[in-house]
């Protein structure tokens, strides 16, 4: 058995690290199979040497996030634990250094996982970036944040957000209300990120000035989109023809981000996904990046991560037991 203590800088920091009713400490105990004792600003672990060392590394990662004013929610603590198991907790400092934008309420936006950081770096470095991954990985929200940052710094003169009109089995014709209401209904998820970043009043003014456009994918046909930050969301529900049409709308001074989840295709049976097609066809082209986020990058409720993993397992074909070779009769 080994024993190791961590002396935190203040009672306030200790309270944040320990969590409400010591919930973070209990999580560390359960995940690393150690015993923890909290006294003032001191946290002492007892257990197997490698488990104690990993628990200390996880606390180091939590301290790093606190220094960057990142709230220690359960999912954040679990991510620290995941990195500590691989000895990568020091890489959390990289997240602190990567500032994206500030919300309308003054909250700074940083990547919450190393996968998200890779995604942001790809967007900065490339003209077209594909962000592929399950729900909850922040791929759309971070793309919107990067678009707002580019707009505010005058790198682009407008923001365009679009998505195909097929999702969860619905088409615009089957939604209630007039066409504008139908558009608003299925494009609403794209509004949320913009309103959070800009505030409702600023967002509305920019829409009226046509500096922000949120429209169905069909509205992109026949246009050349210059000097714009363009985001195609739910791209798994495009056909190959739609994807080609969209990508070839890109004009001078524009940047494109395409987001989607290849496991959630809602197209009619036997219709190929334009996203899957594009990922294959455009692989290796300079200026086009592909970033794959995983369940480790899910930053919603911890159950979302487990749900994603369960569905991924269910999607895998069952393993067949090896068949015994038929016995041959001796001549």
Model-derived features: positions:
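Conserved loop-to-helix interface motifs that mediate assembly, gating, or partner/ligand docking
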Residues: 86-114
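Conserved helicase motor core of SF1/SF2 NTP-dependent helicases
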Residues: 42, 104-116, 122-232, 236-331
């Amino acid at each position: 058995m080994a024993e190791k203590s961590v002396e935190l800088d203040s009672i306030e920091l200790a309270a944040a690290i320990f969590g409400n009713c010591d919930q973070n400490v209990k999580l560390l105990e359960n995940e690393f199979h150690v015993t923890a004792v909290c006294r003032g600003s001191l946290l002492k672990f007892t257990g197997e040497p490698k488990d104690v060392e990993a628990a200390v590394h996880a606390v180091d990662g939590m301290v790093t996030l606190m220094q960057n004013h990142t709230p220690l929610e359960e999912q954040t603590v679990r991510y620290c634990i995941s990195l500590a198991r691989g000895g990568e907790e020091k890489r959390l400092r990289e997240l602190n250094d990567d500032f994206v934008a500030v919300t309308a309420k003054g909250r700074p936006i940083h990547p919450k996982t190393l996968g998200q950081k890779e995604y942001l770096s790809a967007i900065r470095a490339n003209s077209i970036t594909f962000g592929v991954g399950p729900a909850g990985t922040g791929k759309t929200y971070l793309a919107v944040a990067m678009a707002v940052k580019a707009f505010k710094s005058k790198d682009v003169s407008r923001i365009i957000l679009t998505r195909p009109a097929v999702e969860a089995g619905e088409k615009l014709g089957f939604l209630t209300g007039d066409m504008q209401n139908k558009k608003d209904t299925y494009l609403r998820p794209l509004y949320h990120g913009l309103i959070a970043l800009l505030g409702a009043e600023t967002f509305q003014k920019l829409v009226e000035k046509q500096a922000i456009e949120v429209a169905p994918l069909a509205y992109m046909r026949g246009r050349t989109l210059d000097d714009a930050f363009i985001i195609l969301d739910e791209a798994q529900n495009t056909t190959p023809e739609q994807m080609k049409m969209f990508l070839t709308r890109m004009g001078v001074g524009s940047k494109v981000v395409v987001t989607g989840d290849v496991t959630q295709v809602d197209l009619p049976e036997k219709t190929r996904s334009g996203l899957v097609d594009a990922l294959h066809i455009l692989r290796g082209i300079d200026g086009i990046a592909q970033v794959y986020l995983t369940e480790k990058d899910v930053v919603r409720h911890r159950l979302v991560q487990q749900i994603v993993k369960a569905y991924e397992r269910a999607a895998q074909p069952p393993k067949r037991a090896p068949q015994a070779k038929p016995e041959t009769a001796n001549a």
